[in-house]
């Protein structure tokens, strides 16, 4: 009676295929880990805080002109006359809640398709400009999948910046910089005269962030 057996070459083939599969899995895992680490680094930078400067436009919309890492999140709004003020936490949360309602009913420009029509030229309101900035990743994090996984948001968020250069500066800043302590001191000084028509803040954080920027 013949005994069942396998040729050595059969095991060699199986072993070779197993090795190829393992190499493929390790390679894919390595690429995924690299992307995960890169995204994690950027997310951690944003989560630590962002100093954002929004500028009012002639159509009463708002654009991000500068933003960079800070140990705490602050949002400065500059009106058409050049006056600046720092938004309070209560005011920011109110704006975000209002924008969240628009996101839920589909009227927020952040989640609408970018058709290039009149809807695009009318610009973004203050709430949508905040959520489109780096600070939106912190302040609007609880909105979650309503916003950040929306493909229209990914495109529209870039349009909340005044120029491609402003957007690129932000990306570079959050990719390789650490939170700046000077941003906190500057923001605290900017809170004086919050509800008044204060002149542009003279804090280093604001002035250094906008130096040489064409407004």
Curated annotation (Swiss-Prot):
Broad class of the protein's primary localization: membrane
Q: Where is the lipid attached (S-diacylglycerol cysteine)?
A: 28
This protein's superkingdom?
A: Bacteria
> InterPro entries from the xrefs?
UPF0323 (IPR020913)
Q: Where is the composition biased (Low complexity)?
A: 197-208
Which range is the signal sequence, renumbered to this chain?
A: 1-27
Residues bearing a lipid moiety (N-palmitoyl cysteine): 28
Q: How does it sit in the membrane?
A: Lipid-anchor
Q: Where in the cell is it found?
A: Cell membrane
Q: Where is the composition biased (Polar residues)?
A: 158-181
Keyword Membrane (UniProt): yes
Q: Where is this region: Disordered?
A: 158-215
**What keywords appear on the UniProt entry?**
Cell membrane, Lipoprotein, Membrane, Palmitate, Signal
Any one of the GO CC terms: plasma membrane
| UniProt key word Signal | yes
Q: Spell out the HAMAP family in the cross-references.
A: UPF0323
Q: Which family does it belong to?
A: Belongs to the UPF0323 family.
This chain's protein is named UPF0323 lipoprotein Hac_0309
Upper classification of the organism? Bacteria, Pseudomonadati, Campylobacterota, Epsilonproteobacteria, Campylobacterales
């Amino acid at each position: 009676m013949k005994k069942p057996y396998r040729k050595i070459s059969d095991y060699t083939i199986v072993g070779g295929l197993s090795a190829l599969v393992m190499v493929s899995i390790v390679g894919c895992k390595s690429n995924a880990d690299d992307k995960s680490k890169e995204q994690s680094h950027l997310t951690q930078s944003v989560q630590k805080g962002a100093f954002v400067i929004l500028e009012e436009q002639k159509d009463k919309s708002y654009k991000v002109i500068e933003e960079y890492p800070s140990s705490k999140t602050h949002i400065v709004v500059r009106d058409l006359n050049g006056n600046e003020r720092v938004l309070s936490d209560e005011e920011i949360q109110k704006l975000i809640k209002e924008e969240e309602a628009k996101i839920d009913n589909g009227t927020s420009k952040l989640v609408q398709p970018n058709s290039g029509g009149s809807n695009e030229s009318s610009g973004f309101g203050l709430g949508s400009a905040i959520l489109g900035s780096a600070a939106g990743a912190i302040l609007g994090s609880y909105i979650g999948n309503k916003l950040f996984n929306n493909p229209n948001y990914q495109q529209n968020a870039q349009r909340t910046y005044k120029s491609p250069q402003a957007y690129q500066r932000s990306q570079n800043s959050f990719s390789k910089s650490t939170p700046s302590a000077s941003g906190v001191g500057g923001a605290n000084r900017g809170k004086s005269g919050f509800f008044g028509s204060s002149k542009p803040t003279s804090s280093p954080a604001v002035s250094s962030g906008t130096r040489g920027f064409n407004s």
